[in-house]
Amino acid sequence: MMEPQEKSLITDEVRAVVGKGTEPATSTDKVTLTEIRRFSQAVMDESPIYHDEEVAAKTKFGGVVAPGPFTYHYIRRRPPGTEDPMLTEPDDWDGEDSRGVGGGALTVPWPPNMRTFHGGNELEVLQLAKPGDIITSKTQITEVYEKTGRSGRLGLSVRETVFTNQKGEILCIDRYTGVAREMK
């Protein structure tokens, strides 16, 4: 006797979120030499291209630049005067902002028997931020799909955040994979 075919985790409601996006969000401050230097120290990469204007001027960049992940970090700072999310989010908040960096709800309506977790990020750096840049981001759900893992069925979603400077040039693209695991 054949077992009945399980319903797909990719329902019409789940499929409908593909292409949905946030409003653009712009950094509250211009990128500064001090912020770049502090970030490079925090990630323990003190290359002179991140803080020495004379050395950096002689490189292919023509001046000081920020390490690749700086852009992703910089836009995520909350504006002055806003509430700390640790005080406003639910107790089980994992620090991941399902609203996307640009704000506005970007959640996937998985079936109720699903529990979600962070499946990883891929950061594609196309250009490095420079002092004076104003960074803007916009997030969009680009893909949802299903696969079977050792523990059962999984639903996966990909949120793509594009970071640009004030000239509209793409600095980097972050691809976040969210995983929804079926609970039995």
Predicted regions and their residues:
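Hot-dog-fold acyl-thioester-processing enzymes
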Residues: 2-120
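HotDog/MaoC-like acyl-thioester-processing domains
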Residues: 2-24, 117-184
